[in-house]
A protein has these predicted regions:
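Intrinsic disorder/low-complexity segments
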Residues: 201, 250-332
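Conserved NTP-donor binding/palm subdomain of two-metal-ion nucleotidyltransferases/polymerases, i.e.
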Residues: 2-125, 130-253, 332-445
C-alpha cells in the first residue's frame, strides 16, 4: 500500500494552490519544510510552477530562508529565459524543415507550455518535432545533413540548434504490445493531416504547428505510458496532461452531458460506461478560431488563465437551445471517440489510474475526467512517480548500474514489477526489445 509522506502531502496541497483559481491558502503550509518542498519540486521539474504559487502567498506565509527564496527565484527566472530560447528554436527548426519541403508538428514541449496559465513557468526539455514522411525517407534526409545520427523506432537525433537538443520524429510515439502499437500507428496516420495544419503563434516570435487537443488526449497518454514502462515519469508530464484535459473542456465548454456521479466508482473498479449512452445526435465539432494568442513582446508576459495558446469559440454569448444542443452533441461525440481509442489501444485501465491522480493530486473535478478514475491503478502509478521522478532519474530502485548489461537487467526487473498491472505491455517488452535490435541494425549507418 502506498504511503505518502507528510511533506509530499503538503507539496500536493501547495501544487493545487499554485495551479488553481482558488485563493484559499492551504492550512498545511504552516507545517511546510520549504527545503523539502524545493527538493521535491526539483525532482519533479515543477520549480517554476510552484514559484508562481509562492508569488501568490502573503509574505507571512513564506516561511523559508532568504537564501532559498533567492535560489528559487533565480531558477524560475532561468526557466523563463529557457522557454524564450526554446520558443525561438522550435520556430526556426520548423521553418528550416518547411523550406526543405517537410511539414512538421511540434510535439509536447512548447505547445504544452501554451496551455499553462504562465507558459514561462514550465520546465522545458528538448524539441520533439514530428516530420511528415515514412521513417526511411526522414532518416535518409537527416543523415544527409548529419551522417552519424542514431535512429530508433520512432525518432532520430538531429544537430542541436543554439544548444537546444532536437529529436526528429517520424512516429509520435509507440506501444510495446505489437497489436496495440499497430492500431496506434494507424490512428496517427488517420489524423496526421489535422496536426500538420494546426498552426499557432508563440508569442510574437513566430508560428508553429502543434497537435489538436483531441490528438493530445491520446498521444500524450501514450507518451506517459511509454515512460512508465521504460524509465519512469514525473509530475511534470502529469501536469501537462492536466492542462490537456482543461484545454479539452475549454474547447467543448458547457457542452458535456457527463455528470460527476458517472466517475465516482468503487475503489479498484475498472468498469466503464458504454460510450453509446453518452452519444449525441450530431457529429460536428465546434469551430476553432485560427487567430492565436499573442504576448506583447515575445517574452514572458501575463497570459489569461482561460487561454490555452489560441482563441476558442466563445460559448458564453450564445445560450440558445439550438446552440447548446449542437455543442453538447459534438462534445459527447468527441469524448466517445477518445474513449473508443483508449479501449482499442488497451489503455483504459491506465487512463483510469491517471484520472485518479488528476483528482487526488491536481484537484480536478470529476466532471472533467475522460474515463472513470481507477484507485488501484492510480495509487500504483503515483507511487512510481514519487519513487522515480522525472524520467526515472531519481529512482533508488535502479540497482544494476549504468552498463548495457545493467540497463537490460533493470528493464527485466521493471517488467516483473509492472506485469501485474499491465501484462500485455510488460510481457511484450522483451520481445519488442529483441525486434527493435534488428530494426536498428537495418537502419544503422
Amino acid at each position: 500500500m502506498m504511503i505518502v509522506s507528510k511533506q509530499h502531502q503538503i507539496f500536493f496541497d501547495f501544487l493545487r494552490f499554485s495551479i488553481g483559481p482558488k485563493s484559499e491558502i492551504p492550512s498545511s503550509l504552516k507545517e511546510a519544510d520549504w527545503k523539502a518542498l524545493y527538493r521535491i519540486a526539483q525532482k519533479q521539474c515543477l520549480v517554476g510552477v510552484l514559484f508562481d504559487g509562492i508569488k501568490k502567498l502573503p509574505a507571512e506565509y513564506v516561511g523559508m530562508k532568504k537564501e532559498l527564496l533567492l535560489q528559487w527565484m533565480a531558477e524560475s527566472q532561468m526557466l523563463e529565459k529557457a522557454n524564450v530560447r526554446l520558443n525561438d528554436a522550435a520556430i526556426q527548426v520548423s521553418e528550416w524543415f518547411r523550406k526543405k519541403g517537410f511539414r512538421t508538428c511540434i510535439l509536447k514541449g512548447q505547445g504544452n507550455a501554451l496551455m499553462y496559465p504562465n507558459p514561462y513557468s514550465r520546465t522545458p526539455g528538448d524539441i520533439d518535432i514530428w516530420v511528415e514522411g515514412e521513417d526511411k525517407r526522414v532518416i535518409s534526409f537527416v543523415r544527409s545533413i548529419s551522417p552519424h545520427e542514431k535512429a530508433c523506432y520512432h525518432h532520430i537525433g538531429f544537430p542541436s540548434y543554439k544548444g537546444v537538443e532536437v529529436e526528429v520524429h517520424y512516429r509520435p510515439s509507440f506501444l510495446l504490445c505489437f497489436w496495440h502499437n499497430r492500431k496506434l500507428q494507424k490512428y496517427y496516420e488517420r489524423v496526421k493531416e489535422e496536426q500538420f495544419s494546426h498552426r499557432v503563434m508563440l508569442g510574437k516570435q513566430g508560428e508553429i504547428a502543434i497537435p489538436t487537443v483531441e490528438f493530445n488526449l491520446i498521444f500524450q497518454l501514450t507518451h506517459i505510458f511509454s515512460h512508465l514502462m521504460n524509465e519512469g515519469i514525473g509530475l511534470r508530464q502529469l501536469l501537462d496532461y492536466y492542462y490537456v484535459l482543461c484545454d479539452f473542456y475549454k474547447v467543448y465548454q458547457k457542452s458535456s452531458k457527463i455528470t460527476p456521479s458517472l466517475f465516482t466508482l468503487k475503489e479498484g473498479s475498472t468498469s466503464h460506461p458504454d460510450p453509446l449512452t453518452l452519444r449525441g445526435e450530431g457529429g460536428n465539432r465546434p469551430i476553432r478560431c485560427s487567430e492565436p494568442l499573442r504576448s506583447k513582446d515575445g517574452g514572458p508576459s501575463k497570459v489569461s488563465p482561460d487561454s490555452a495558446g489560441w482563441d476558442r469559440l466563445s460559448i458564453e454569448g450564445d445560450n440558445s437551445a439550438g446552440s447548446t444542443t449542437a455543442v453538447t452533441s459534438s462534445a459527447s461525440t468527441a469524448l466517445d471517440e477518445v474513449q473508443e481509442e483508449l479501449k482499442e489501444l488497451g489503455l483504459w485501465k491506465f487512463a483510469g489510474g491517471i484520472m485518479y491522480i488528476m483528482q487526488e493530486v491536481f484537484g480536478m473535478s470529476a466532471s472533467r475526467l475522460i474515463v472513470p478514475p481507477n484507485e488501484k491503478y492510480g495509487k500504483f502509478v503515483l507511487n512510481e512517480v514519487l519513487e522515480a521522478g522525472n524520467f526515472g532519474r531519481h529512482d533508488a530502485r535502479n540497482r544494476f548500474g549504468r552498463s548495457q548489461l545493467g540497463h537490460n537487467l533493470q528493464r527485466v526487473y521493471r517488467d516483473i514489477r509492472l506485469v501485474r498491472y499491465f501484462p500485455a505491455e510488460a510481457l511484450c517488452e522483451p520481445l519488442f526489445r529483441t525486434w527493435h535490435f534488428f530494426w536498428r541494425l537495418k537502419y544503422k549507418k
